[in-house]
């Protein structure tokens, strides 16, 4: 391809599935690698001489180097020049990322500081009651209420809503993001484009989780979502954490001292694949590990719990009729 800028863009598309619309050589670009609003996980820089560039995705952990010519055709000097440019770009990217992480940490620390512990009858406890957790008290302490959290869709503020807020925490105890579930005052899901959202990260998210409970007697369970993890805990008594997505379930780093792992998998392709990946890692580390999956395709354990909670009420109505 004669146009090196277009060739670089084509390589980014092939590697990430997304690319910036405009690439200006010599400048760092951030761009979306998903359909999520405000996603800037992708990054790239084409060098001024147009002979090379770097690109990747912070969320996926991808870091690639591109050369306009086949590496085997480069002279030793050209290889040295490319390596020098890659090193300079890497240093610049890492500095930018550290600053972005620091900015994100400051923003979500402010949000967390505005949250309050749950009390019966607040929007979060009403929401969880609707999800089948009525009568469960105390609820996990990491779940908090924000009384009026702004909701942004792109650059548009759609309003403020009560929200269930939970920290995403690394194995060494660092909070790297906040998970938010937007609600109404009576505990319904808010009428917003995405009810559940993650803040910008303050560090790598891979392997982190929402620590609803700590391990007990060397045993811990994990599920994708908060409600799914809580359903697994309520049904089995196994203390659970939430991975917040299938990809992070597969990459989860269990705490030191864990000897038995229970995976409450979602009954879909992504859920099964993530559970299988985590189980393979756990077994390789000589942990006891079992995967529990709902029998209904597409269901998760929160769905199973909700259906079980509805069954007695339906039976009572039939008896009254």
What are these regions (language model features)?
Residues 1-130, 269, 273, 290:
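Non-catalytic accessory segments of DNA primases and related replication-initiation nucleases
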Residues 29-39, 147-155, 299-304:
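Short, solvent-exposed polar/charged micro-motifs at secondary-structure junctions
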Residues 152-256:
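Phosphate-handling DNA/RNA-contact segment within nucleic-acid enzymes
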Residues 134-159:
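Short, basic/aromatic recognition patches
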Residues 117-122, 134-142, 176:
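Short secondary-structure capping/junction motifs at helix and strand boundaries
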Residues 1-5, 64-67, 188, 217-221, ...:
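TOPRIM fold recognition
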Residues 15, 130-134, 234-235, 284:
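Residues at alpha-helix termini
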